[in-house]
């Protein structure tokens, strides 16, 4: 892959989601990431495989509605968030936490 293509793939993945449900899914070899809301499943798969050198078996995505926030009398919307649950091949792992 070219460096330009890899740098664009790095922008697809924003951060890992660390919740109790996502941590329990690690036992099933499923990792949850917050991704760009415009990213499609093939782009997410290519980004995960290129950045972490793993084989992706399946991807589930969810695009929940934006939440409304108020500050005083002003009302606004929070930024759009898309989550991707990525299932990896048997034997592949992503190092999310440093080992101690």
From Swiss-Prot:
One term under GO cellular component: ribosome
Provide the GO biological process annotations: translation
For this protein, the record's Pfam families field holds: Ribosomal_L23
Between which residues do disulfide bridges form?
Answer: none
Listed A to Z, the keywords are: Ribonucleoprotein, Ribosomal protein, RNA-binding, rRNA-binding
For molecular function, the Gene Ontology terms on record are: rRNA binding; structural constituent of ribosome
Q: InterPro entries this protein is in? A: Nucleotide-bd_a/b_plait_sf, Ribosomal_uL23-like, Ribosomal_uL23/eL15/eS24_sf, Ribosomal_uL23_CS
- What is the annotated quaternary arrangement, including any partners? Part of the 50S ribosomal subunit. Contacts protein L29, and trigger factor when it is bound to the ribosome.
State the family it belongs to. Answer: Belongs to the universal ribosomal protein uL23 family.
Instruction: Give the matching NCBIfam families.
Output: PRK05738.2-4, PRK05738.3-1, PRK05738.3-2, PRK05738.3-4
PANTHER family given in the database record: 60S RIBOSOMAL PROTEIN L23A (PTHR11620)
Functional note: One of the early assembly proteins it binds 23S rRNA. One of the proteins that surrounds the polypeptide exit tunnel on the outside of the ribosome. Forms the main docking site for trigger factor binding to the ribosome.
According to UniProt, the name of this protein is: Large ribosomal subunit protein uL23
Species of the source: Prochlorococcus marinus (strain MIT 9515)
